[in-house]
Structures are given as structure tokens and as C-alpha cells.
Swiss-Prot record:
EC assignment: 2.7.11.1
Organism whose genome encodes this protein: Candida glabrata (strain ATCC 2001 / BCRC 20586 / JCM 3761 / NBRC 0622 / NRRL Y-65 / CBS 138)
Name of the molecule in the record: Serine/threonine-protein kinase STE20
Binding locations of ATP: 626-634, 649
Region (Disordered): 73-109, 180-338, 427-503, 534-598, 894-915
Compartments, as annotated in UniProt: Cytoplasm; Nucleus
Biased composition (Polar residues): 184-233, 243-252, 260-284, 431-447, 492-503
Length: 915
């Protein structure tokens, strides 16, 4: 109740009061007039009764702070207990649980909980006595001994909404006094939680009390009783008002009393409570009531246990449902892309020992097997890292086919530019006419590739005629020496040169229809061979394997191939592939498929435009199959009008992985008419096969001449002059050849020299076959390519210098080294050393040095080399090469005859792998 109301209540009872504030919104009415009926017999003043009725009418509201008073004298208590019993019975009918606390001479003083805003806090002060006289004497004795009672402590409820106990604490002296009181059958002060819980169970109701969400900063209620004065002095300090209340609900009992039910329904109404409701006399019924309270308390605890069990079972059910949901959802979830990556490898150099630290095991094995010593690794750490990265890039290459590279699309005619522009967006990986990643050298109008590309000229086995690439070779075929090491002097080994026509003069011509219409039977075998190589493990250490091959049914003559592989194991490169959802993956695959179909239609439409109409069988006759690739065969034929020999390559477009490159190559070659380039003649599209007709060079490749003959400086000069003329033309057109070597230099019987991109030739032997199928050897590569630097057309000049060494010594430098070590030596040694440099003239030495300058800026161009004295003064005429070409052909025929005799005597046990 309010302070004003309390002031009015003080004179009504005639008792001195001290105010004490409990930190609650309200307390229910206490039994302040339990024995007023007995006091009324002593003092029957009606006015006192009326005033007490007014006190009951002015009950406390729920939102008001609760005040309580204590009595310091037994005389004052006896004056306060004079209330009529009949009025107590009338008040009992109205009674609810709201009133102020009056600790008079009472058997029991209870402070019960009141519902307010869904919060609850239980607090009680219970004083019990056996009878009225004992209570009066006890209170007087307590007053004399100045016993001090502490105010009630409030404890917050637990998570289940039930307070463990709210205890009324009593000082140690009071506890000793209470023990004495119990022994003398005096007033029993029950301050423990059992009495409190018993009181709650007797009420059988769920009550809610609003408690502050924050504890008051400071609250002190001190009640001091005077020993003899009979007056009570209270010292109270201000406390901060609590903030918004927190709501906790206590479980209600199954049995509820009518009075508390009314109170719960009307929490804000005031009601009067008569002393009859609050008074518990010392009567024979008291033990029965205590037993009832005990049983009710047990019922309350059993209800609490049931609620706890029910809550725990609900929690288990919810947890199981959550786990089932998570397990069902986890089956459909996809793993996200990696995050928070770790730096696993960090390569460094030990400052004390100078050795590498942190190298992956694969790299260490690769370097150990490559022949690169630790000393070399320590001396050129960056070079080793560069060549290993370069080697891995080439090994992981997906098979981009080698075509004549262009580095200035602006120099091409509009037809080429327009046709190529349609396909530039189709495949960003191709190199021809690709503008991305090729910085421009403005002074020359050239583009220099910012990313070195591997030598991936996928040549046909016939070392002479192809401007169209075959499908990519296996990874282990990329860095393989194109010829074995020279034979020791005096040592003779059985020749294993492959023979297309053991005796060319006796070779029978197959009908045109038979060669064209019949699908090449070795194509399927070669396709399987290529696939098995691609899917095979990483390259092994150098090894030599020889195998005999059976004759091909479609070839006009038996052929044999010796597979001489020299490979190095490449460390795997860890790659992270992000996981794509199934639907997104399907959509992406469908889009890619649609794009492929669209590009295929565009390609066929464009090929139909540029290809000549008609059937090639009607224009060319006497087709002789001289080679077989994975995508088709190579034939020699005669033009029905001019009777000139031509080379025809038949390609199945469905087997070509890079169809756009074929179109690009045709368009480039149509614009590259030159006397030193194997020229494109015509093309046909018949029944899904593309027929490319090219100029035929019957003398074969320069490799045959280099292998079987020794060249003079004049003859070397003639080869260099004709090669430089072809390079000058290509460079003027903005084309990078990037694969200048003896395999791609073709000769006629008269000694004429022409460049070809893929090294087709009329006759192939074991070396030719190896050099054409195992392409991309590093031995002719320029240092800037190996070191992953930008490069331009001068890479062809370096390759020309290596080819000069090849003509002088019969093989390129480092041919006997492993591919990785060869890359390392190219990157670190710079200009290779000749075995016998003193045998060369000064003119040739200077010319060679100019070609092999490590710095591309110091290296000569094709035009500058054509003006060098070695070309202008020493180089001989082309006719000087004719005897060498004929001599090489004779030696090849002899080797073929030996091979034919060996094939007749030995059983054929291995399948034909001739390409």
C-alpha cells in the first residue's frame, strides 16, 4: 500500500511502527489479526474494530511496494488483538491474499506470493507458537534479549520456473533462541525452505511474482529492537528501483484452494482477510494440519519431478528430431569450395648448407632422376624452379595442337580476320590469331607471347607433308629425343628403319576407290593406343623398348616401328576443383553441349565455303597410302590434269579435338604462298572427311640427310639460306613457326628446300617416326621459352642455330641428357658448346654465335642473317644438296631391305602401331 495509507494505519492500531521495504511489488495480506477475537473480550472498543476493518479495506495493490512493521512490546500486541470473532468470519468470506504484514502475537505470520505480470518470487516469514500465552511470553522474552531478525532473502527461480527455496534468514543469536523456544514449546520460527514449500503446497496454487531483471544496487533493511524501551527503530537506506521485470511461471498444483483461485483471477483487486483465516491456534488439529502439509509438500515435489521428467523427454525428442533433420539435410548438402587454404610447401635455401629446403618429394625425385646434381640446384635455384614449372606446364598440357603461330592478326587479309574472329571466342586456348596474353612489340608490329608455349607440333609420322595437326600426343611423348645417340664407331646394329615401300619401283598402286572408301584399319588401333598413353601413369625414367610390328592390311607394303621412349616422371600438381551442385552442373553441361553443336555447325558451314566442291577421287588418281595418323591417313597421288605428285591428308573431323585450328591453318596456308614453304593446293569436304592437298616433296626431310650424310659448310649455308627465306616470309606475315628443326625441313630430289609445319614426308624410318610422333622436344627451344619469359619471332632464329649444330654434329645439343636436365642446361648454360669448335671457319662460327645469342635483343633477325657473309659468300647452290638427298634415299632403301628380311624370318607377335 502507499505511504499515505500506512500513516493512517499507524494510529488505528496504536502501535509504534518502523517501515521496512522488501524489493517486491506486493505481498499478499498477512494474518495480522489472528487472535483479535480474544483481544476483543479484553478490549471491546468498537472503534478499534472499525479502524481494523478500515485497515482490511485498504489492502495493498500489486504494484505498490510492500511494507511491514514489527512490534517491540508485548503490551502493544495485547492491545492490538481485540477484534470481534463475528467480524473475522465476515472477512473470511471476502478474503483474498492481499494485506500488510503485522507481526503481532500470532501463531503464524505468512508472507505469501502474489501474481503480478507473470513473475514470481516466494517469500515468507512464519512465526508459530503453541498457544496465545506462550506466544506473548516468547515475544516479551525476545524483546528483552534484543533479538534481531533479518529480513527475508529472495531467491530467483530456476529455468523450470520453480524456486528451489526462498529462505528467511535469521542471525545466529536468533537461531540459538529459536532452539530454546522449540524446547520450551514456545513460538516456532520456521525459516527454512521446507516450511515455505509446505505453505505453498497448502495453498495448492501457482503464483507469479514480478521480480526485477536487475538486482538493486544497494538495499539494506536493518531492524533493531531495543532491549527495554519497547519501541522499534528501523534504519532504511534507499535502493534503486528495478527495471523491467522478468517473467517466470511456477507449475501449479492439481488441487487449488478457492481463495487463491479467486486471487489469481483477480490479481489487482483488494480484499479483506479475517483473522480466522490467518490464525492457527494451538489446538489438537495442528498435528493433523502438519501431516496434511507434509503430504501436500510431497505431492508438490512429485509434481515437480514429473514436470522435470516431461521436460527432459521433450528435450530428448526435440534433440532427436533435430538430429534427424540434420542427417536428412546433410545427405543433400554439397561440400563447399575450399576455404582457409594452407601453405603446405615453402621452398627455400639453407643458409648454412646451401641446400634446398621444403621441396616436395616428387620434385626431389624428379630432380634426382633428371641428373641435376645438388650443386647445380644450389647454384641456379631460380632456373630449377622455372624449368620444373615449365616441365609441369607442358606435361599437364591438354593437347593443344601445334599450328603455324601468328602474332600480328592485323597483317592478315580481311578474309582471314573475319573468319577467325568467329572462332576466337570459341576456344581461348588456341594460339593462332589469339590476341589475349600476347603483349605487342610496337616497333616491329609483332606480338610477343607472354606465356611460353610448349613445342606441341603434332606431326604426322610421314616426315614431310602436313599443315594440319593430328590429335595431341600423350604427355610422356612431349620431351623425347627425336633420334637415338650416334652409334659407336665400328659397331653395327640391325637396322630397324620403317619402310613404307621396301622397293618403291615395285610397289603396286592401290585403286583410288579402295584407298578412299575403306576406313583406315590402323586408325582405331592408334586411337586406342593414344588413349592408353594419355591415361597412363606419368612418364618413367629413360628406357629403350623395341618391338616388331605386323604388316598393315591397308598399307601397300609392310612397315615396322621401334618405340624408343625416354621419359621422366612428373610430380603431380594438386588441383582444387570446386564442387558444383548437380543442377548447375547439368545446366553447364547442356550449355557446353549446345555451344559445341553450334560451333560444329559454324565450322562445317565455313569449311563448305572455303573447300572446293566435288569428289577428290575424280581429280586425283593412284592414291598410295604412305602413313596413318589417329585422325586419318596420308596418301601420295597424281593430279589427273598436270600429272604432278601431291600429298593428300585425309582427316576424320569427328576425331579432331581442335577443329577450329584446322580451319585456321587452312586460312593461313592459303595466304602463305612462297617458294620455301610447302604450299597448300586445295581442300575438299566429302562424307564428313576433310581432304587437304599439299605440295609433295619426294626427297624427304633434312633429318634423313643429317642422319646418313655429312654436310659441308657450303651445303649448310644453302640449307640456312632457304630456311631463312621461308622464315623471313612468315615473320613478315606475323607468323611464328616455333618448331624449326630438321624434321620440318623438306627437300626435293633436286635439292629444293621448303618449310613445313608438321614434318610429313614420303618415306619415314624409325627415327623419323619417333621424331614426328614424340614431338615437343626441348632441345631446339630458346632459353626465353624454357625460362617462361616473353618471346617473339627470334625464337625461330635460335632454333635455326640449334639446327646448324645438328647438321654439323648429327644431333642437337643435350640429346643424350634427360629432358628435364636438357631444359636446365638450356636455361643455365646459354649458348651450347660445340664438340669440335676448331673445325669450323670463323665465318660459320660468327654466324652461329649470332643465331645463338642468349639475349633476344642481341640475336639477329632473318633479314640480317640473309646479309651475313656466311650466306652471301660461303653458301652453295641448292643443287649441291641433290647428291645428299639421293644418297640418303639409297641408304634408307638398304635399311628397308634389311628390315624386310628380318620381318620374314621372325614371327609377328606384336600389333602394328605405325602412325
Amino acid at each position: 500500500m502507499s505511504n499515505a495509507n500506512q500513516k493512517e494505519n499507524v494510529p488505528s492500531l496504536g502501535l509504534p511502527r518502523t517501515h521496512g521495504t522488501l524489493n517486491v511489488n506486493a505481498l499478499k495480506a498477512t494474518d495480522i489479526l489472528k487472535h483479535k477475537g480474544k483481544l476483543n473480550e479484553v478490549n471491546s472498543d468498537q472503534s478499534t474494530t472499525n479502524e481494523n476493518d478500515e485497515v482490511q479495506e485498504e489492502a495493498v495493490f500489486l504494484d505498490d511496494p510492500v511494507h511491514f512493521t514489527r512490534v517491540s512490546s508485548s503490551s502493544e500486541l495485547s492491545a492490538a488483538l481485540s477484534v470481534n470473532t463475528t467480524e473475522q468470519e465476515q472477512d473470511e468470506e471476502k478474503g483474498t491474499e492481499h494485506a500488510e504484514l503485522e507481526p503481532a502475537e500470532e501463531d503464524t505470520v505468512e508472507v505469501d506470493t502474489i501474481r503480478n505480470n507473470g513473475d514470481k518470487t516466494y517469500s515468507t516469514i512464519r512465526e508459530s507458537a503453541s498457544d496465545f500465552e506462550t506466544t506473548n511470553n516468547t515475544l516479551i522474552e525476545i524483546s528483552k534479549n534484543s533479538s534481531t531478525y533479518s529480513s527475508t532473502e529472495f531467491l530467483n527461480n530456476n529455468n523450470n520456473g520453480i524456486s528451489n527455496s526462498n529462505r528467511a534468514t535469521i542471525d545466529s543469536e536468533s537461531k540459538l533462541r529459536m532452539n530454546k523456544l522449540r524446547e520450551g514449546s514456545s513460538t516456532s520460527l520456521s525459516n527454512d525452505s521446507n516450511g515455505f514449500n509446505g505453505m505453498i503446497s497448502s495453498n495448492q496454487a501457482s503464483t507469479v511474482l514480478s521480480t526485477p531483471s536487475q538486482k538493486p544496487s544497494s538495499t539494506t533493511n536493518t531492524i533493531t529492537k531495543a532491549n527495554n524501551g519497547g519501541s522499534t527503530r528501523a534504519q532504511k537506506e534507499k535502493h534503486t528501483s528495478p527495471k523491467l521485470p522478468s517473467t517466470v511461471t511456477a507449475p501449479s498444483s492439481h488441487r487449488k484452494s478457492a481463495d487463491l483461485s479467486k486471487t489469481n483471477k483477480l490479481p489487482s483487486t483488494t480484499a479483506k482477510r479475517t483473522p480466522k483465516q490467518a490464525v492457527t491456534s494451538s489446538s489438537p488439529k495442528e498435528p493433523a494440519k502438519r501431516k496434511s502439509s507434509t503430504s501436500k509438500m510431497k505431492g508438490m515435489f512429485s509434481s515437480l519431478v514429473q514436470n522435470m521428467k516431461r521436460n527432459s523427454s521433450d528435450n530428448r525428442k526435440s534433440a532427436s528430431s533435430l538430429s534427424s533433420v540434420s542427417s536428412s539435410s546433410s545427405s543433400t548438402l554439397k561440400i563447399s569450395t575450399p576455404y582457409n587454404p594452407k601453405h603446405i610447401y615453402h621452398v627455400g635455401v639453407d643458409a648454412r648448407t646451401g641446400e634446398y629446403t621444403g621441396l616436395p618429394e616428387e620434385w626431389e625425385r624428379l630432380l634426382a632422376s633428371s641428373g641435376i646434381s645438388r650443386k647445380e640446384q644450389q647454384q641456379n635455384m631460380q632456373a630449377v624452379i622455372d624449368i620444373v614449372n615449365f616441365y609441369q606446364d607442358v606435361a599437364d598440357h591438354t593437347g593443344e595442337e601445334k599450328v603455324i603461330k601468328t602474332f600480328d592478326p592485323k597483317k592478315q587479309n580481311p578474309l582471314v580476320r573475319d573468319s577467325l574472329s568467329k572462332y576466337e571466342q570459341v576456344d581461348d586456348n588456341r594460339t593462332s590469331y589469339a590476341s589475349g596474353g600476347t603483349p605487342t612489340l610496337e616497333q616491329n608490329g609483332f606480338h610477343t607471347s607472354s606465356t611460353p608455349r610448349s613445342r606441341t607440333s603434332l606431326t604426322s609420322p610421314t616426315a614431310g607433308y602436313s599443315m594440319i595437326s593430328t590429335p595431341p600426343m600423350a604427355t610422356q611423348e612431349k620431351y623425347i629425343p627425336t633420334r637415338p645417340a650416334p652409334k659407336p664407331p665400328g659397331q653395327q646394329t640391325p637396322s630397324s628403319n620403317a619402310s613404307l615401300t621396301p622397293k618403291m619401283q615395285n610397289a603396286t598402286m592401290s585403286p583410288i576407290k579402295e584407298n578412299i572408301s575403306s576406313p583406315v584399319t590402323k586408325s582405331e588401333v592408334d586411337d586406342e593406343l593414344l588413349l592408353s598413353k594419355k591415361n597412363a601413369s606419368l612418364p618413367k625414367l629413360p628406357s629403350d623398348d623395341s618391338s616388331s610390328h605386323k604388316k598393315s592390311a591397308t598399307d601397300s607394303a609392310p612397315t615396322s616401328v621401334e618405340t624408343d621412349t625416354e621419359t621422366v616422371k612428373v610430380p603431380p600438381i594438386p588441383k582444387t576443383t570446386p564442387t558444383v551442385p548437380a543442377k548447375a552442373s547439368r545446366r553447364s553441361n547442356e550449355k557446353k553441349k549446345e555451344e559445341r553443336e553450334r560451333n560444329k555447325k559454324l565450322l562445317y558451314a565455313k569449311l563448305t565455303e572455303i573447300c572446293s566442291p566435288g569428289d577428290p577421287k575424280s581429280k586425283y588418281r593412284d592414291l598410295i597410302k604412305i602413313g596413318q595418323g589417329a585422325s586419318g591417313g596420308v596418301y601420295i597421288a597424281h593430279d589427273t590434269e598436270s600429272e604432278d605428285s601431291v600429298a593428300i591428308k585425309q582427316m576424320n573431323l569427328e576425331k579432331q579435338p581442335k577443329k577450329e585450328l584446322i580451319l585456321n591453318e587452312i586460312l593461313v596456308m592459303r595466304e602463305s604462298k612462297h617458294s620455301n614453304i610447302v604450299n597448300f593446293i586445295d581442300s575438299y569436304l566429302a562424307k564428313g572427311d576433310l581432304w587437304i592437298v599439299m605440295e609433295y616433296m619426294e626427297g624427304g626431310s633434312l633429318t634423313d640427310v643429317v642422319t646418313h650424310c655429312l654436310l659441308s659448310e657450303g651445303q649448310i649455308g644453302a640449307v640456312c639460306r632457304e630456311t631463312l627465306k621461308g622464315l623471313q616470309f612468315l615473320h613478315s606475315k606475323g607468323v611464328l613457326h616455333r618448331d624449326i628443326k630438321s624434321d620440318n625441313i623438306l627437300l626435293s630430289l633436286k635439292g629444293n628446300i621448303k618449310l613445313t609445319d608438321f614434318g610429313f614426308c614420303a618415306q619415314i624410318n624409325e627415327n623419323n617416326l619417333k621424331r614426328t610422333t614424340m614431338v615437343g622436344t626441348p632441345y631446339w627451344m630458346a632459353p626465353e621459352v624454357v625460362s617462361r619469359k616473353e618471346y617473339g619471332p627470334k625464337v625461330d632464329i635460335w632454333s635455326l642455330g640449334i639446327m646448324i649444330i645438328e647438321m654439323i654434329e648429327g644431333e642437337p645439343p643435350y640429346l643424350n641428357e634427360t629432358p628435364l636436365r636438357a631444359l636446365y642446361l638450356i636455361a643455365t648454360n646459354g649458348t651450347p658448346k660445340l664438340k669440335e669448335p676448331e673445325a669450323l671457319s670463323d665465318t660459320l662460327t660468327k654466324f652461329l654465335d649470332w643465331c645463338l645469342k642468349v639475349d633476344p635483343s642481341e640475336r639477329a633477325t632473318a633479314t640480317e642473317l640473309l646479309d651475313d657473309p656466311f650466306i652471301t659468300e660461303i653458301a652453295e647452290d641448292n643443287s649441291s644438296l641433290s647428291p645428299l638427298v639421293k644418297l640418303a634415299r639409297i641408304k634408307k632403301l638398304e635399311e628397308q631391305e634389311e628390315d624386310a628380311g628380318t620381318d620374314e624370318t621372325e614371327p609377328e607377335t606384336t600389333p602394328d602401331t605405325t602412325i
